[in-house]
A protein has these predicted regions:
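Catalytic cores of processing enzymes, dominated by hydrolases/peptidases
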Residues: 54-118
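Active-site/substrate-binding loop(s) of hydrolase catalytic cores
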Residues: 1-60, 103, 113-125
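Structural beta-strand segments of beta-rich domains
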Residues: 166-172
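Intrinsically disordered or highly flexible coil/loop and linker segments, enriched in small
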Residues: 36, 82, 147-150
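Surface-exposed, proline-enriched loop/turn segments that connect beta strands in immunoglobulin-like
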Residues: 156-160
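Extracytoplasmic/secreted proteins, especially bacterial periplasmic and envelope-associated proteins
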Residues: 22-29, 35, 64-68, 72, ...
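His/Asp/Glu-rich mid-to-C-terminal helical/loop segments that flank catalytic regions of hydrolases
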Residues: 123-155
Length: 175
């Protein structure tokens, strides 16, 4: 019961069994049907960006990639990046990030959870706070959508290389 509860009126209710709730069934269907590369699962609160593994105390195989992608997302909002243990201070079970990342749907999906807002916002922020909270993730969401199709890092080590990019192609000319 780390980070979740079997009690229906709890803020961290997980359902009676894996995929027992219609929302989780819908997400599982989408992950199985479409070739996602990135996923964001919004929660409140803490101004964190949480990535797998969250159910155990060890880094996932792509821990460094998650941290690099997370730093890109958090450039504007300065969210703290890490696992649930590293950010909120406890492990969580039954989380969507761990399942989406580990699920073999034909490709790896980097799934992360932005936790929006401050402690005083709580799990259910006031309606008057929604717009400001949404603004904290706007730039990150825009960057995230750009990364969803093509994500790579390129360093020019030699000025003799000329790089030209179009939507579907990168040309490198060596002088």
């Amino acid at each position: 019961d780390n980070g979740s509860s079997p009690t229906g009126n709890s803020d961290v209710y997980r359902g009676i069994a894996a995929f027992s709730e219609p929302e989780t069934q819908a997400i599982a269907f989408l992950i199985d049907q479409y070739p996602f590369s990135l996923a964001l699962n919004y929660h409140t609160y803490g101004n964190y960006l949480i990535h797998p593994w969250n159910h155990i105390d060890e880094p996932c195989p792509d821990d460094e990639s998650f941290k690099n992608i997370g730093r890109t997302y958090a450039q504007q909002n300065k969210f703290a990046i890490g696992t649930a243990q590293e950010t909120v201070g406890y492990k969580t079970n039954g989380g969507s990030d761990d399942w989406i990342y580990a699920h073999d749907a034909g490709q790896k999906v980097y799934s992360m959870t932005p936790e929006l807002g401050l402690q005083e916002d709580g799990f259910w922020p006031a309606k008057s706070r929604i717009r400001d909270l949404a603004k904290t993730t706007l730039k990150g969401n825009q960057l995230w959508s750009k990364m969803a199709h093509r994500y790579f890092e390129l360093s020019i080590l030699d000025p003799l290389y000329l790089i030209k990019s179009t939507d579907n192609q990168i040309d490198i000319l060596i002088n």
